[in-house]
Each structure stands twice: as structure tokens, then as C-alpha cells.
């Protein structure tokens, strides 16, 4: 038995320095709270144990939202990327997504340096074994060395280290990601405190030596020449021009035969793996079995950094035995002679059932305790970072005795993510998708600053200088809209020729420039050229104005739906309501309401298994004052 001793006191303690923990700790420190960030290993701060990239559909928007609120992830990737690409450029603005290939080692070093040089923030290596909980309130943590740290709020971000178990074929051993030390006792402590845990599984592919790849047999995927950024503070002139390409290749029938011949040794199919894996990131053996009609699957070869030869074999996640992995790799075009530097593996880990959380990410049964990241059942660095930021903000507010901060489904993808977790729970690693957002034309990649910067400034995470620049951008958008309404586009041969070139009907009479801009494929730059009028030099201002005008009708429809949502969100459900007193509720609805304890009628409406009749009964029960009579 290790003897405990009283160590330092803090306002906020964050356990785990992955992508969630880093955002949580930085937010707390920036809000003026004395913060301790504890990690199992200092070499794993903001480490990328799987894909060395940031962003993509929905996820890229989350990174922009983190930046707009004053978080770090966007700045960190802008300082350390080796390639940047905008995805879905041929589609509408609601689904466009920025994705960056990271130098994973630089990413870790840059984040660690940021943390080490942030006032109010202490970084320490230790394993947290136990929470200090008194009368249902979390008041600190105890480490494996016996140090007892006291705090007003605690944030847990254990990632995949919680009772982590790595599986490679027949080999199984206790481990955190990338062969790090796992966290065992903390999970046991959470169970003793009454938390419901479950097992999830994720996996990672082999890494191969880039010097042994025959790139002539693969297809190049270069970065964009047009400057792109995740952070609104990054400058176009700093955009990296000499980017490192990724490469694309495919599996083939030989690969699939190797996999099928060894399914009797595949932990995914032998029953060895008990945890539920991610639906949207299946292992290659799972894909071959589930999609037996496909004769090939796409693979991306992604460099892990500028100073390493390790290449990540994307979309090739596997837990097959090592010698089988070698055969699989060598069957792929371009990888016939590739040297495998690290085998792929599966990892099982504990997660907290997220219905046990409030929208602030505070736990319902232990006050002043917050959880964030993969331990809440999500997958992905970006989802983790978004949760970490919200948990860190609320831990800091809680430490100051202030009310919590939440984002709605109409505010941000982060709001969609947290609401899905809290009201619906998840039976598998949750991945954020654009299809999960009802208001995705409002929640775009390009307008995260317009949606969220004001919140960040009020919280103390956005500086006055940055907020002033934001206000100037908003004014420039208004000025540009007004300018377009003043300018007339006249019928000229040049205008008619231009319209013909983009497949548009010719003009019959002159129109205001904002009306002309509604036409597909017309830009403000085109209007400037055709009219000789200078409108605005900032491409980001032009982008906002163009989208606002072209999609005005659709945006108005979404705003109408959001107004209805807000009316429902305003209808609060008393916290101590007894659902057993409500006559007529379906049994499933009664059980779900009792378990999840929704705070508003809008949240109750989103719980799976609840039908409109149940909502009507609940609404009438509250509105008619029956609740108040019962509780007198």
C-alpha cells in the first residue's frame, strides 16, 4: 500500500494530455485558473497514435470551431502540417472540409512547448489511480506515487489508456496506445463510484519505410496551392508551398485471399476482441468480409513527418498476426518490397457511458468532475479536442462558482457531438459526420468565427485585439453587401459572353450586382471585372458574402427551423421530476427519461425510442402545473 501525502492545490486538474486534455488544460489556464495537467508520459503530449492528420468532413469544421472559441488545435496544425487540402470543393459549402497531413512529431513538440510556456499551467508526469470524492463532490486526485493533489474541479481525458489492451493476432498484452503504460486503477475507481463503463475497440494500420515504397505504382495526392488555414489568425503569406505529397494505391484479389485464408487467426473473427469497433473506420479484414463483392479497396500512403521515413498505410487498419500483415502489405501495388517498421494492432479500452453526463460534460453523479474525449465514446482527435475545450471551460467556470457554458445543435458541430452523446448515448465509437447536423448549411467550415468568436471573447479565451479584427471583418461583410446593392451590372457584350461561357441564360435588362451574384458560378471577382468597380480585397469577406447571397433561401429555411428548436429548448424540465408520476407515458419513454434526465423538451424529443405522444404527455404534464402540485 503506497502512503499518500498532500501535494499542491489547484483550481483545475486535467488528467491525460492527449488532444482533449491539452485543450481542457489550456482553456482553464487561459481563463485564469491555476491548472495542473497530469499525463502518463510527457513524450505522449498531443501524440497521434493513429492517423497523422487533422480535419476532414465535419472534423475540419470542429477544428475551426475550436479556433473560433480560442482553442489551440488549429494553430498547432497550421504550424506543423506537411500538406493541406480542401476536400469536396465540387460540392456545396455545407460539406466542404479542410484536411491537413501533420508532422506528428512536430505537432507533439509544438503543443508541449505551448503548454510549458502558458501561465497558470503546470505539466507533470504521473499516473492517476484514484479520485478524491467527498459527499458526491470531486476534490482532487491521487497518483500511483501517493501524491494527493487538491482541486475545485477535475477533468478526466484518459483516451484509450483506460485498461487498454493491445491485440496483434494471438498476442495480447496490457498497454496504452503505441505501447505506453495503461491506466488500470482509475477505471476500477470509477466503477466503485457508480459509473457504468463499457469496452470499445479501435485499431491502427502498419507503418512502412518510405524508402522501400515503389511510388511509380501509386497515384500522387498533392496539397493545394491556394492558401488554406485552420486558424483564423494564420496568414496567407505563411502558407507552406513545398508540401509533401500523399500517395494512393489499392488492395487487390491477392490481398483479399491472404486475409480470407487467415480469418481463423483474425482476433476480429475468433472472438478474442470483445470491444465494439468503429463503424466508419473498419479494419481491412472487416471490409474484405463485409464487402465481399469488391475486388479492391483504396489505400492512402501518408508520410508521418519531415524527419522520419515512417509511412502510415491509411485505411489498412488490422490486428492480424504480424507475418500475415507482412503478406498483406507485400500484395499491394507499390508495397511489394516495403519494410514494415511497426505492425498494426487493435486496442480495447474503457469508456464512460455518455448518458451519465450533462451537456457541460460534468458527470451527473459526481459534481465538479468532467470527462472528455475518447473516454466518452468518441473516435478522432478532433472530436476529442472539441470536448476537451468545452470540459476545460466548464471546469474553470465551476471552479469560479459560475454557471456552465454549452453549445446547441444550432451553434456548432461540437454542440451536435455533445448533444448526441448525452441524449442518445452510443453503442460504438462515435464519429462526427455532416449528416448528423440538421443545420449544416449554418454550421459551415467558413463561418465558425462568425458563430463562435463572441462566445470565446466573453469567456476570456479570445484577446481584445483578435476580437477587434473580428468586428472589422463583420463590418466589412456588411459594407460589401451594401456595395453590391449599389452597383448595377448592365447588359453588355462582355457580360453576355461571360454568361454564355458559364452556361447561364443571357440578361434581358440590367440588375443590381447582388441579384446578379445569385446566378451559379458568378463570383464577386467576376462582378469587379465586368463592372470595373472595386468591391473588397479580402477573399474571406467575399466568400461570406457570396455564400450568404447564393444560399439565402436555404439559410432562411434553416433559421426558421432553428427558431422552433430554440422555443423547445426554452421549455425546461424540472430537474427533480418523477417520471413515475406521469400517467400515460410508454414504458420505454419512462425508462429513457429516467436514465438520461433531459433538461428541456427539445432534448427529450431527440432521445431514441421516444414518440410524439410521449412528448405531448410530458409537455402537458409540466404546462398544466401537475408537477408543481405533486411536489408541494
Curated annotation (Swiss-Prot):
<dbReference type="InterPro" id="IPR049312">
    <property type="entry name" value="GIDA_C_N"/>
</dbReference>
<keyword id="KW-0274">FAD</keyword>
<dbReference type="GO" id="GO:0005829">
    <property type="term" value="C:cytosol"/>
</dbReference>
<dbReference type="InterPro" id="IPR020595">
    <property type="entry name" value="MnmG-rel_CS"/>
</dbReference>
<comment type="subunit">
    <text>Homodimer. Heterotetramer of two MnmE and two MnmG subunits.</text>
</comment>
<dbReference type="InterPro" id="IPR004416">
    <property type="entry name" value="MnmG"/>
</dbReference>
<dbReference type="InterPro" id="IPR047001">
    <property type="entry name" value="MnmG_C_subdom"/>
</dbReference>
<dbReference type="InterPro" id="IPR044920">
    <property type="entry name" value="MnmG_C_subdom_sf"/>
</dbReference>
<feature type="binding site">
    <location>
        <position position="374"/>
    </location>
    <ligand>
        <name>FAD</name>
    </ligand>
</feature>
<keyword id="KW-0819">tRNA processing</keyword>
<dbReference type="Pfam" id="PF01134">
    <property type="entry name" value="GIDA"/>
</dbReference>
<dbReference type="GO" id="GO:0050660">
    <property type="term" value="F:flavin adenine dinucleotide binding"/>
</dbReference>
<dbReference type="Pfam" id="PF13932">
    <property type="entry name" value="SAM_GIDA_C"/>
</dbReference>
<feature type="binding site">
    <location>
        <begin position="277"/>
        <end position="291"/>
    </location>
    <ligand>
        <name>NAD(+)</name>
    </ligand>
</feature>
<dbReference type="GO" id="GO:0030488">
    <property type="term" value="P:tRNA methylation"/>
</dbReference>
<feature type="region of interest" description="Disordered">
    <location>
        <begin position="206"/>
        <end position="225"/>
    </location>
</feature>
<dbReference type="InterPro" id="IPR040131">
    <property type="entry name" value="MnmG_N"/>
</dbReference>
<keyword id="KW-0520">NAD</keyword>
<feature type="binding site">
    <location>
        <position position="128"/>
    </location>
    <ligand>
        <name>FAD</name>
    </ligand>
</feature>
<dbReference type="InterPro" id="IPR026904">
    <property type="entry name" value="MnmG_C"/>
</dbReference>
<keyword id="KW-0963">Cytoplasm</keyword>
<feature type="compositionally biased region" description="Basic and acidic residues">
    <location>
        <begin position="216"/>
        <end position="225"/>
    </location>
</feature>
<protein>
    <recommendedName>
        <fullName>tRNA uridine 5-carboxymethylaminomethyl modification enzyme MnmG</fullName>
    </recommendedName>
</protein>
<dbReference type="InterPro" id="IPR036188">
    <property type="entry name" value="FAD/NAD-bd_sf"/>
</dbReference>
<comment type="similarity">
    <text>Belongs to the MnmG family.</text>
</comment>
<dbReference type="GO" id="GO:0002098">
    <property type="term" value="P:tRNA wobble uridine modification"/>
</dbReference>
<comment type="function">
    <text>NAD-binding protein involved in the addition of a carboxymethylaminomethyl (cmnm) group at the wobble position (U34) of certain tRNAs, forming tRNA-cmnm(5)s(2)U34.</text>
</comment>
<feature type="binding site">
    <location>
        <position position="183"/>
    </location>
    <ligand>
        <name>FAD</name>
    </ligand>
</feature>
<dbReference type="InterPro" id="IPR002218">
    <property type="entry name" value="MnmG-rel"/>
</dbReference>
<feature type="binding site">
    <location>
        <begin position="16"/>
        <end position="21"/>
    </location>
    <ligand>
        <name>FAD</name>
    </ligand>
</feature>
<dbReference type="Pfam" id="PF21680">
    <property type="entry name" value="GIDA_C_1st"/>
</dbReference>
<keyword id="KW-0285">Flavoprotein</keyword>
Amino acid at each position: 500500500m503506497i502512503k499518500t501525502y498532500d501535494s499542491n492545490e489547484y483550481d483545475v486538474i486535467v488528467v491525460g494530455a492527449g488532444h482533449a486534455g491539452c485543450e481542457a488544460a489550456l482553456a482553464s489556464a487561459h481563463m485564469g485558473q491555476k491548472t495542473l495537467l497530469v499525463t502518463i508520459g510527457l513524450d505522449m503530449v498531443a501524440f497521434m497514435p493513429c492517423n497523422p492528420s487533422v480535419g476532414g468532413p465535419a472534423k475540419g469544421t470542429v477544428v475551426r470551431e475550436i479556433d473560433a472559441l480560442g482553442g489551440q488545435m488549429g494553430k498547432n496544425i497550421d504550424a506543423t502540417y506537411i500538406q493541406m487540402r480542401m476536400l469536396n470543393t465540387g460540392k456545396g459549402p455545407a460539406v466542404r472540409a479542410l484536411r491537413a497531413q501533420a508532422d506528428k512529431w512536430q505537432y507533439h513538440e509544438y503543443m508541449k512547448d505551448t503548454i510549458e510556456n502558458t501561465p497558470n499551467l503546470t505539466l507533470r508526469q504521473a499516473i492517476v489511480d484514484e479520485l478524491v470524492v467527498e459527499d458526491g463532490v470531486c476534490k482532487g486526485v491521487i497518483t500511483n506515487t501517493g501524491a494527493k493533489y487538491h482541486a475545485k474541479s477535475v477533468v478526466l481525458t484518459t483516451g484509450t489508456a483506460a485498461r487498454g489492451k493491445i491485440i496483434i493476432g494471438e498476442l495480447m498484452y496490457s498497454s496504452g496506445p503505441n505501447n505506453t503504460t495503461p491506466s488500470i486503477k482509475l477505471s476500477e475507481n470509477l466503477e466503485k463510484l457508480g459509473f457504468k463503463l463499457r469496452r470499445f475497440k479501435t485499431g491502427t494500420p502498419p507503418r512502412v519505410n518510405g524508402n522501400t515504397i515503389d511510388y511509380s505504382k501509386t497515384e500522387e495526392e498533392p496539397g493545394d496551392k491556394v492558401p488554406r488555414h485552420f486558424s483564423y489568425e494564420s496568414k496567407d503569406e505563411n502558407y507552406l508551398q513545398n508540401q509533401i505529397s500523399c500517395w494512393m494505391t489499392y488492395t487487390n484479389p491477392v490481398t483479399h485471399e491472404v486475409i480470407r485464408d487467415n480469418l481463423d487467426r483474425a482476433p476480429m473473427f475468433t472472438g478474442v476482441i470483445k470491444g465494439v469497433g468503429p463503424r466508419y473506420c473498419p479494419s481491412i479484414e472487416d471490409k474484405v468480409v463485409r464487402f465481399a463483392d469488391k475486388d479492391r479497396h483504396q489505400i492512402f500512403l501518408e508520410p508521418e513527418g519531415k524527419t522520419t521515413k515512417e509511412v502510415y498505410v491509411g485505411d489498412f487498419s488490422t490486428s492480424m498476426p504480424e507475418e500475415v500483415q507482412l503478406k498483406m502489405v507485400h500484395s499491394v501495388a507499390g508495397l511489394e518490397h516495403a519494410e514494415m517498421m511497426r505492425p498494426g494492432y487493435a486496442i480495447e479500452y474503457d469508456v464512460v457511458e455518455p448518458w451519465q453526463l450533462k451537456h457541460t460534460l460534468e458527470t451527473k453523479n459526481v459534481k465538479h468532475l468532467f470527462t472528455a474525449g475518447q473516454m466518452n465514446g468518441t473516435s478522432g482527435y478532433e472530436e476529442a479536442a472539441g470536448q476537451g475545450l468545452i470540459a476545460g471551460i466548464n471546469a474553470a467556470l465551476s471552479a469560479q462558482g459560475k454557471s456552465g457554458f454549452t453549445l446547441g445543435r444550432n451553434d456548432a458541430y461540437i454542440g451536435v457531438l455533445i448533444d448526441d452523446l448525452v441524449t442518445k448515448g452510443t453503442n460504438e465509437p462515435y464519429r462526427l459526420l455532416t449528416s448528423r447536423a440538421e443545420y449544416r448549411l449554418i454550421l459551415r467550415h467558413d463561418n465558425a468565427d462568425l458563430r463562435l468568436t463572441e462566445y470565446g471573447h466573453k469567456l476570456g479565451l479570445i484577446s481584445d485585439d483578435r476580437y477587434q479584427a473580428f468586428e472589422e471583418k463583420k463590418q466589412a461583410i456588411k459594407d460589401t453587401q451594401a456595395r453590391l446593392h449599389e452597383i448595377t451590372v448592365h447588359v453588355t457584350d462582355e457580360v453576355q459572353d461571360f454568361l454564355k461561357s458559364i452556361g447561364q441564360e443571357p440578361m434581358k435588362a440590367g440588375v443590381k450586382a447582388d441579384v446578379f451574384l445569385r446566378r451559379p458560378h458568378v463570383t464577386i471577382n467576376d462582378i469587379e471585372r465586368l463592372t470595373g468597380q472595386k468591391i473588397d480585397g479580402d477573399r474571406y469577406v467575399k466568400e461570406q458574402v457570396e455564400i450568404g447571397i447564393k444560399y439565402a433561401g436555404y439559410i432562411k429555411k434553416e433559421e426558421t427551423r432553428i427558431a422552433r428548436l430554440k422555443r423547445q429548448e426554452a421549455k425546461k424540465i424540472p430537474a427533480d421530476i418523477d417520471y413515475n408520476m406521469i400517467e400515460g407515458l410508454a414504458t420505454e419513454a419512462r425508462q429513457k427519461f429516467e436514465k438520461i434526465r433531459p433538461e428541456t423538451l427539445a432534448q427529450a424529443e431527440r432521445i431514441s425510442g421516444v414518440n410524439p405522444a410521449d412528448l405531448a404527455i410530458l409537455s402537458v404534464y409540466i404546462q398544466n402545473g401537475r408537477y408543481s402540485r405533486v411536489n408541494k
